[in-house]
Amino acid sequence: MTKFETVRGMKDYIGIDAEKIRYLESTFRDLAIKYGYSEIITPVVEEFKLFALKGGEELRETMYVFKDKADRELSLRPEITPSVARAYIQNLQSSPKPIRLFYFGTVYRYDEPQYGRYREFRQAGIEMIGDSSILADLEVLDLLYNFYDKLNLSNDITIKINNIGIFRKIMDKYNIEDNLQEHILHLIDKNKINEALDILEKNLKNKDIIDFFYKILTKKDTKLEDIESLAELEEVSRLDIKSEFLYLFRLSRILSDLNIKFKIDLGFVRGLAYYTGLIFEVLHPSVQFSIAGGGRYDKLIELYGGLPSPAIGFAIGVERTLLVIKDLKVEEPVNVIVIGMSEDTIPSMFMVSRILRKEEYKVVINTKDQPLSKLLPYYASQGFKVAIIIGKQELEKNMITVRNLITRKQISVPLENIEDAIKQTL
């Protein structure tokens, strides 16, 4: 006999585990809407090139890629930002800017499964397209911080930030081609600093610049005053990157004023190849990996064939975020079981259930053919708090019995008083 199980790296979420995911989704959705963002739902399947073009080395190696019956090369989305960029070009390019969009969906990567890493997982994210200002960057970071504040995690998390534009500008100045830039940044992301510096040395042939790269790549915990000092260095002016340091200084100063906990890491880069400026990740002390991340990608829209449009966004790892929440208590409605004692009571069972569901109770109708003495302890063990018992003789008098399955307190009341009776027994 054939036995089917979940595909390796994927998981079923049942009951409370599914409810936790939905709770995070609704919390994020409500917050994003309050910030003025509109929801976007994009297909799970896109053209392979959409992600391969600027996804970065690691992402390309872990994509689920296949050909359809028309011999088109397609992919399950490994992230959602490129899909939003494609949808923007296709549907929203002529709309007033900036465009604010949020999403929640599954993504797929053929990684080696381990703690905090799955082959199917969920991302909640936002994208702001058409605004290059520091206010846009601050809004995105503020939304991200406030999401974790809603989960009572804001005191525990740290947002790690950097400006990848520092590296980009230097490499652009010395005409290092995009593919090589991508590879160098990939090595830095994997903490292979010496390999990255070796490649830079071969291409730049300038020891002063290599020394400067080493200096900033190894400066992990940078203070605000350090950024201001670096901006005044002669080599910074010579490399035309003073504005990139001053931007980081301005952003950091305002984040401090907003009481957002962050740290500057000049050696930090992100693996996705489309980032051009601000980059950031959310860290939590209980895990070794980031639980959210994002950045500015000012050239991606144009690369996809759209008009030049600055953009910034982030993605939250939903499952990873759940791992760091110790006691997430999802508020559940009161569970009510409706038990009819004869066939004559069936219409009343459904009528009572309709009334209670309108009042946000979670109502189940008993389908078991067992005596009441067995049903009551069974449903108590299943988490039901209240039983509505409808007997034939009671019904003739328009009466029902409401029983608290925990305290065993019960009262008989007229049918129209059912809601008050439930509150009275709880």
Curated annotation (Swiss-Prot):
This protein's GO CC annotations: cytoplasm
Source superkingdom: Archaea
Protein name, UniProt field: Histidine--tRNA ligase
The record ties this protein, via Pfam families, to: HGTP_anticodon (PF03129), tRNA-synt_His (PF13393)
Record keyword Calcium present:
no
List UniProt keywords, sorted A-Z.
Aminoacyl-tRNA synthetase, ATP-binding, Cytoplasm, Ligase, Nucleotide-binding, Protein biosynthesis
Q: Name one GO biological process term.
A: histidyl-tRNA aminoacylation
Molecular function via GO: ATP binding; histidine-tRNA ligase activity
EC id: 6.1.1.21
**Does the keyword Transport feature in the UniProt annotation?**
no
InterPro entries referenced in this protein's UniProt entry, alphabetically: aa-tRNA-synth_II, aa-tRNA-synth_II/BPL/LPL, Anticodon-bd, Anticodon-bd_dom_sf, His-tRNA-ligase, HisRS-like_core, HisRS/HisZ, HisZ
Its gene name is: hisS
- Name the predominant localization: cytoplasm
- Localization: Cytoplasm
UniProt organism field:
Saccharolobus islandicus (strain Y.N.15.51 / Yellowstone #2) (Sulfolobus islandicus)
Q: Write out the catalysed reaction.
A: tRNA(His) + L-histidine + ATP = L-histidyl-tRNA(His) + AMP + diphosphate + H(+)
- What family name appears in the similarity comment? Belongs to the class-II aminoacyl-tRNA synthetase family.
Report the HAMAP family cross-referenced here: His_tRNA_synth, HisZ
